[in-house]
């Protein structure tokens, strides 16, 4: 049976683009790939071909820690009323899966309208703080300034281009600083596309690679809920 392999239009790299880029390179450095695809798509680029803000990567500004009192401002995440499908899924998870903790299904968008709400909420409230504290953690604050858009992207409720455009527009309008916007866009245009490229290029052998030789079982403290 003849099969036609169609490209996934919910990614921004073209078929064969990653493998062509990697050909002849000894090390697949994500930063180099990220710059290449930014140039091609014109994301965070100026008319003269230079990166917006004068630098390609502002990660050095994105490593702040909270002071002793913790985050100065936090935002309650949007929650959604469970529909019939979510309710059934919750029952199935409780019945058939022995998982640690409690489900958080009410916090995750399950349709396009909800996904757009989460995106707009992130751009309006959290993106301005995302860059400074994207690596920070604080007790009893599981969300902080993160977007919660990973599942919406992977389930194709949002297109990566619309998410990137929303973030870039926030910087160009003065709503969010460049380090926050560039750091966020790098997660989607850089890491998301890069990891997909590695997956398609290296699998299935890649699944069994173990460069660090990790073969010990995780200790009990990973499962006990106490540290």
Where do the model's predicted regions map?
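Conserved functional hotspot residues or short segments at active or partner-binding sites
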Residues: 114
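Gly/Thr-rich phosphate-binding loop signature of adenosyl cofactor/nucleotide-binding cores
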Residues: 117-120, 124-227
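Beta-rich, aromatic/charged-enriched effector core domains that present basic-aromatic interfaces
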Residues: 1-108
